[in-house]
Amino acid sequence: MFHFFNSRPMLEFLEGLTTIQGLISDPYYIGGGFHETGRGGKLGIHADFRINEQLHLHRRINVIVYLNDNWKPEYGGELELWDRDMKAKRLSVAPLFNRCVIFNTDADSYHGHPDPLQTPDGVMRRSIALYYYTASKEIYKDVPSISTIYHARPGDDAATQREARQLRFDQHLRQWVPPALLRYVHAIQRRLRR
């Protein structure tokens, strides 16, 4: 099940639903995974962490799937979703089996199940929590964007060495020459090779 939630079809579904492109699942389930709460347990209203410090990713989406067979209303445990100003509860979601809740993670996406569970002993509120992230374009400030860098091995024939030099030269051109001018340079190179 966890594999499915981290799969490409799931990521594409979430991207289509949320219009957030480039979603990345968390293979480590930091803060996520299988959650279980017993009688008297609760989770106060809160806004989640937004940076995965291990992977340096921006958290964007929460997905919660409930695993509670025969859940009764008197048990409580409803997920509450609050407005940005914490003035009004916008939605209350019972944790029924196979119910899936998907919502954005931002600085004021307040949620939780703040009332103590009233379950019989041995009855647990169970869920799977999954978080989805995006990478930041700020990485380009720290790491230059280059494509694969080719080198010939010592002893490679002249054609292989020439090809590797040309590929490296093209890489340097892409870093420093505007795209319109680069097309012109490549056109000249093609003519010279004839």
Predicted segments with their positions:
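Catalytic core of Fe(II)/2-oxoglutarate
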Residues: 40, 50-59, 69-194
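A structural signal for short, well-ordered beta-strand segments
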Residues: 32-34, 63-65, 128-132
